[in-house]
Swiss-Prot record:
GO terms for cellular component: cytosolic large ribosomal subunit. Residues 24-34, 221-231 have a biased composition (Basic and acidic residues). InterPro entries: NA-bd_OB-fold (IPR012340), Rib_uL2_dom2 (IPR014722), Ribosomal_uL2 (IPR002171), Ribosomal_uL2_arc_euk (IPR023672), Ribosomal_uL2_C (IPR022669), Ribosomal_uL2_CS (IPR022671), Ribosomal_uL2_dom3 (IPR014726), Ribosomal_uL2_RNA-bd_dom (IPR022666). The keyword RNA-binding applies. GO terms for molecular function: rRNA binding; structural constituent of ribosome. Keywords: Ribonucleoprotein, Ribosomal protein, RNA-binding, rRNA-binding. HAMAP family: Ribosomal_uL2_A. Pfam families: Ribosomal_L2, Ribosomal_L2_C. The lineage of its organism: Archaea, Methanobacteriati, Methanobacteriota, Stenosarchaea group, Halobacteria. Belongs to the universal ribosomal protein uL2 family. GO terms for biological process: cytoplasmic translation. This is Large ribosomal subunit protein uL2. The keyword Nucleotide-binding does not apply. The gene is rpl2. Residues 1-38, 198-243 are annotated as: Disordered.
Amino acid sequence: MGRRIQGQRRGRGTSTFRAPSHRYKAELSHKQSESDDTITGTIVDIEHDPARSAPVAAVEFDDGDRRLVLAPEGIRVGETMQIGVSAEIKPGNTLPLREIPEGVPVCNVESQVGDGGKFARASGTSAQLMTHDRDVVVIELPSGETKRLSPACQATIGVVAGGGRTEKPFVKAGKKHHKMKARGIKWPRVRGVAMNAVDHPFGGGGRQHPGQPKSVSRDAPPGRKVGDIASKRTGRGGNGSSE
């Protein structure tokens, strides 16, 4: 019998495969204001959060609440930030979509009213507000997909800070190691065909090849369930992986 493959080890849930969520700063969400009220806060710090690719801003609001919010480009410590229907249209302020002019870039857009923000939260990303209607607002996501949302959904004006992050090369393997460890991702990832036969169903042989069909049943036992799992089609034009 061969050794446990990595998928079986991951299933145990040891610290090697778990995200270090105890280091994450907070779950970011929009502060909810009253229907016609506008809340003002002061940015007191800009911090790094291991949970995400963008920096976060610590804001102290006039009502005494202090919370972390997603930091858009252009904000500075000491500036004020507004939340509400009458907030000024400037980076960092949060308004309902119905109050934001068309063509303005927005980030941390809510999918449902009150969910705190779901779209355009990664560093350097933003959504584009396309059209308004009485019952629906259309936005274009960074992927190019369009979404029809409620006009009451909130969004933050601006582009998420940290743009260009992926353009800087890692250069050293140690830098990549620290990035993956911060996210709880096992790295480096060794291909199955590069392993010995005892370590993986695709291992062994005089050259690197699976040595057997890569398609495998959905009900395959642990240790065999590798390759194209329950694939409808494989090969050219299919959805088969190259592993």
